[in-house]
Amino acid sequence: MKVLSVSSEVFPLIKTGGLADVSGALPIALKAFGVETKTLLPGYPAVMKVIRDPVVRLEFPDLLGEPAAVLEVQHEGLDLLILDAPAYYDRPGGPYVDPLGKDYPDNWRRFAALSLAASEIAAGLLPGWRPDLVHTHDWQAALTSVYMRYYPTPELPSVLTIHNIAFQGQFGPEIFPGLRLPAHAFATDSIEYYGTVGYLKGGLQTAHAITTVSPTYADEILTPEFGMGLEGVIASHIDNLHGIVNGIDTDIWNPATDPVVHTHYGPTTLKNREENRRSIAEFFHLDNDDAPIFCVISRLTWQKGMDIVANIADEIVAMGGKLVVLGSGEAALEGALLASASRHPGRIGVSIGYNEPMSHLMQAGCDAIIIPSRFEPCGLTQLYGLRYGCVPIVARTGGLNDTVIDANHAALAAKVATGIQFSPVTETGMLQAIRRAMHFYADRKLWTQLQKQGMKSDVSWEKSAERYAALYSSLVSKGM
């Protein structure tokens, strides 16, 4: 089976979040199930800089007003189609924002161009290759199925994956003529959304199947609390809604071979984590004692619950714990966490920014990772924690609920517990979870059991890829 995947970011070429990890890992995992994937992504400077010997496969003299070309290249096991459109993508800043952190004002056109190019490839314009199915990711690629509905490929099945419904791609109605869609596409069964143009909404209305990145999140987005205004649209397609948990690349994330980890280890050699623990203490200038090290590796935002972490940091220290934080985000939260580190030298360490190697070392050396998200479609850091024996302490929401088994009495007795869940996501709820963790940590035999059970969890892409392959086959066989 041939699949065209369309994504605005793909690891290891360009990454701002978990979307890139999925777009980069899923195609490789699908190979075991007979799925050949070509992934279309924009030709950002970071992408163009690393690709080697690309071949021009398709040219667009006028792609929504600008020239563009599709380049094909192999990169680290991925078969990539790069949309080389300098007018859209060759600019400073990130994939979506300028160097000052502001959204590019023409994002509507930049990602409509990506979707239009994808629909043309779906129609067979790429010489010698036409997909059996198109799989799009988030709002940046969601217009693909809209273009497919109104142009030559309405019969080709499409899947849309929602990685985070909070990001919907809504724009004013004045941009509609620039999309070059027929006038009747500006309708409630397509991209019209309360008088605006809704990219994600249009994708939801036109895709043949919708997936989210965990079963719990699939249920949550049907509610007003989590649906972000689109719960009614999603409910109208509930028969085509599927929750499939993400996996991680267990070759990259492997404590037995990870080149960043100072001392390698596995479930039977957990004592080797001590050297990594000392490295963490040194990096964050912590006291070298046996107190548990709790870590946070996250965007520092309200959605991620970082205000709660900042508010209880003093109490974590008062309970006898240590805290290290790696991340960046809202200035007020960065400041609050840095202030807590100043108040508690040797007990709290904060590093503002993102450091991929350090994120690996923190998973390998810290005792527990705190993930207090108010909503979390899937989450990856808890999967890394399970893999590395860094016990996850998570909010009971979304994919966190689906991937971490709470250490309640029954789960502990059955020796299946892998972490600690808490609800509600409040200061009180999180402090109760920290107290439970401190209690378990004091019983080293019990703590080691939690670590080992987590490390036995199957966090690979194999099961998830099998489910995606089955969904693809079902849609293709139905002739959607």
UniProtKB/Swiss-Prot annotation:
InterPro entries: Glyco_trans_1 (IPR001296), GS/SS (IPR011835), Starch_synth_cat_dom (IPR013534)
GO annotation (BP), single: glycogen biosynthetic process
EC assignment: 2.4.1.21
Catalytic activity: [(1->4)-alpha-D-glucosyl](n) + ADP-alpha-D-glucose = [(1->4)-alpha-D-glucosyl](n+1) + ADP + H(+)
GO MF annotation: an example: alpha-1,4-glucan glucosyltransferase (ADP-glucose donor) activity
Class of the enzyme per the UniProt entry, highest EC level: transferase
Pathway in which this enzyme or protein is active: Glycan biosynthesis; glycogen biosynthesis
Amino-acid positions noted as binding ADP-alpha-D-glucose in the UniProt annotation, renumbered to this chain: 15
Coiled-coil region(s): none
SUPFAM superfamilies: UDP-Glycosyltransferase/glycogen phosphorylase
Any single Gene Ontology cellular-component annotation: cytosol
Keyword Transit peptide (UniProt): no
HAMAP family: Glycogen_synth (MF_00484)
Family, similarity comment: Belongs to the glycosyltransferase 1 family. Bacterial/plant glycogen synthase subfamily.
Role summary: Synthesizes alpha-1,4-glucan chains using ADP-glucose.
Name of the protein in its database record: Glycogen synthase
The encoding gene: glgA
